Amino acid sequence: MTVLSFIQARELVSTIEQEKTRARVLLDLGLTATNVDINYRFKEVEFSDSKISFKHLNEIANDGEICYYLEKRKSPQKLKIFSADTNLFYKLIPSRDAPTIEISGIKMHRTQERTPWQDTIDKISSLQPLKGRILDTCCCLGYTAITAAKEKDVTQVFTF
């Protein structure tokens, strides 16, 4: 699945304005760079698993509030869901690097003055020395578990 935010969309719009036929962008929550093709004849950007029209791309470029996902032959969809079981609303919020989850209006990471990765590093640093077995209790997007697992004296990370 391709995930886009205003950040990637603006990069692609800029590439289109420069009349380039190929771009390299981060489409998997900031993990790896991917080459995409720009088709001026059909006015769309072609990803390995989907396409998006220039019109929809511009709409996403102007929406800094939420991430979108793309599926074959469908319009971009906002990454959001309401759980009737918990009565909570979840959505994926973009930031300068990795996104964060917002649960009923509360962001799980700071995103104004810090990025989610920086926020996670701050939290882990406040717990030093970190060693042995670690319990991660939130398990939103895994930033804390990933960061804790990289600490040299941590032997295991449990999440739930």
Predicted ranges, named:
Residues 136-138:
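Class I SAM-dependent methyltransferase core
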